[in-house]
Amino acid sequence: MIFDEFSIKTLIRPVQDFPRPGVVFRDITPLFQSPKALRMVADSLIQRYVEADFTHIGALDARGFLVGSILAYELNKPLVLFRKQGKLPADVLSQAYSTEYGEAHLEIHADSLCEGDSVLLFDDLIATGGTLLAAAQLVRRMRANIHEAAAIIDLPELGGSQKLQDIGIPTFTLTAFALSDR
């Protein structure tokens, strides 16, 4: 299936003033209501990574789980979940980070990765980069490597992709929105 950025962008709903005034939230739930759009997103990412040399998919809580699990299944890679604080039942490593909304913690099971593993990080969106940067710090603390950070959407004006690239993490997104896009 050929990727159609226009079709994908029309299914990403802008929600004004959510979760707080002044923020335009990019809601991807309409993508999941369209089997064609979901297949287009998944197939585009699978084509990009089908021959890539990494060992794990690292999916970020919560919307990153949706497509990350499809990628792990289709690419036959183990799926590592990066969860919000307090959601994992066993021993964890934790990393504080800032978001466009405030401060939070990201956690991973302490036995999820081994030294030398290579991880494709996946989230729905790159905004300030806080969540992906925290995931990258956790991966590096486990002496594993980051293959790339990928997402459906980039908000380049918020600088997250650039921050990731500045610390040597390549990024890939299927589409981007300017903050002024409605």
From Swiss-Prot:
Catalytic reactions on record: AMP + diphosphate = 5-phospho-alpha-D-ribose 1-diphosphate + adenine
Location (main, coarse): cytoplasm
InterPro entries found in the cross-reference section: Ade_phspho_trans (IPR005764), PRibTrfase_dom (IPR000836), PRTase-like (IPR029057), UPRTase/APRTase (IPR050054)
Any one biological process term the GO annotation gives: purine ribonucleoside salvage
Keywords on record: Cytoplasm, Glycosyltransferase, Purine salvage, Transferase
EC number assigned by the record: 2.4.2.7
Any one GO molecular-function label of the UniProt entry: AMP binding
Subcellular locations according to the entry: Cytoplasm
One GO CC annotation: cytoplasm
Pathway in which the depicted protein is active: Purine metabolism; AMP biosynthesis via salvage pathway; AMP from adenine: step 1/1
Function summary: Catalyzes a salvage reaction resulting in the formation of AMP, that is energically less costly than de novo synthesis.
Family of the protein in this entry: Belongs to the purine/pyrimidine phosphoribosyltransferase family.
NCBIfam families, A to Z: apt, PRK02304.1-3, PRK02304.1-5
Subunit comment: Homodimer.
Protein name: Adenine phosphoribosyltransferase
Lineage, opening ranks: Bacteria, Pseudomonadati, Pseudomonadota, Gammaproteobacteria, Pseudomonadales
Gene name tied to this protein: apt
